[in-house]
């Protein structure tokens, strides 16, 4: 997993010849010095459409190294098991993974189609009985996986971007037109027949 180290903008202090020459008694505390715009942490933003519920979400869920609890709760609800209504507590790395995939593709802020988010054990069993390629111990049941596509981006490109990040598992489902990504161990697989 690649961790993004973010330093709160108020803790960053830039050294310029003028500040180096300033006596310590005249120095302005770093917290009182506004950070240049280029040093202010950019927000982590997700736009998603859930293909089963028809719901959309457009939300900033993180600023710098701070996750926004209300936004995270809304994402958890959005990614609930659409069969049972059960709301998970998603692994935050999944949200960051989606953001990193968009950045890698050069489409930050693009709307992501969600094919499958969280699954209860009941839903996972149901899918195993009716579809191909559903793992017995799927990371969807741990809220550590998501099946997606991005309109306008081929699923081959999407798969390649996810693989290049080396942040978890990547499943390629070309017939069903989606890519599975998770924050488990780094691995890859492909299912050439219809399935989830």
Question: Which positions does each model-derived feature cover?
Answer:
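Active-site acidic/histidine clusters and adjacent loop/turn architecture
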Residues: 63-115
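Extracytoplasmic/secreted envelope proteins and their assembly/folding machinery
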Residues: 72, 95-102, 124, 128, ...
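Catalytic cores and adjacent binding grooves of peptidoglycan-active enzymes
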Residues: 44, 49, 133-196
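N-terminal secretory targeting signals
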Residues: 1-47, 194-196
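Acidic helix-start/capping segments at beta-turn-to-alpha-helix junctions
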Residues: 110-126
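Charged, often glycine-rich, active-site loop that binds/positions anionic groups
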Residues: 122-136
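Mature N-terminal segment immediately following signal peptide/propeptide cleavage
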Residues: 44-62
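Loop/turn elements at helix/coil->beta-strand transitions in domains of secreted/extracellular proteins
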Residues: 55, 107-112, 166-169
């Amino acid at each position: 997993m690649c961790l993004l180290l973010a330093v709160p903008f108020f803790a960053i202090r830039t050294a310029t010849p003028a500040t180096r020459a300033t006596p310590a008694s005249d120095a302005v505390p770093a917290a009182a010095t506004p950070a240049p715009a280029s040093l202010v942490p950019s927000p982590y933003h997700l736009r998603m459409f859930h293909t089963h519920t028809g719901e959309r979400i457009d939300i900033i869920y993180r600023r710098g190294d701070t996750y926004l609890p209300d936004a995270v709760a809304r994402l958890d609800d959005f990614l609930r098991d659409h069969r049972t209504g059960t709301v998970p507590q998603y692994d935050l790395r999944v949200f960051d993974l989606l953001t990193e995939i968009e950045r890698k593709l050069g489409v930050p802020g693009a709307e992501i189609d969600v094919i499958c988010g969280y699954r209860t054990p009941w839903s996972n069993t149901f899918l195993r009985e009716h579809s191909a390629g559903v793992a017995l111990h799927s990371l969807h049941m741990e809220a550590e996986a998501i099946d997606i596509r991005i309109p306008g981006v081929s699923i081959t490109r999407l798969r390649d971007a996810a693989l290049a990040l080396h942040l978890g598992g990547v499943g390629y489902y070309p017939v069903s037109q989606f890519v599975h990504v998770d924050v488990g161990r780094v691995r890859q697989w492909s299912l050439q027949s219809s399935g989830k």
